[in-house]
């Protein structure tokens, strides 16, 4: 008799587990048959893993004090960050920048644009493949 008591205990435990799981499934099925309200459908939020790119973007947005780009384009955001950094190095903060551009007549900005255009042209020349000799 004593040998069978652990076996009976295991059988009862398994039976109780199956009953609890069956009741859980039944309540979940009954809950899914009810029609959800419109507000619950609109407030659902998609969940995805937060990556290091998201963390960098959030940190950059906090530093720059902006809400961020409308388009979820990491490279465009990085270009904007570098352009803002370059403008800050040249002119200072936003108020100083406007005054310095007005005083210089836009010469500093023209020089920056001229250098960028020159760099693009020189890169394009290096990309050209020389003609092969026969």
UniProtKB/Swiss-Prot annotation:
One of its GO terms (cellular component) is host cell nucleus. Residues 32-60 are annotated as: Disordered. It comes from the Eukaryota. Effector that acts as a broad suppressor of cell death to interrupt plant immunity. Inhibits cell death induced by cell death-inducing proteins, including the PAMP elicitor INF1 from P.infestans. The RxLR-dEER motif acts to carry the protein into the host cell cytoplasm through binding to cell surface phosphatidylinositol-3-phosphate. It is found in: Secreted; Host nucleus. Induction: Expression is up-regulated at the earlier infection stages. Residues 1-22 form the signal peptide. Belongs to the RxLR effector family. Keywords: Host nucleus, Secreted, Signal, Virulence. Coiled coil: none annotated. This is Secreted RxLR effector protein 1. A motif (RxLR-dEER) lies at residues 57-79. Residues 37-52 have a biased composition (Low complexity).
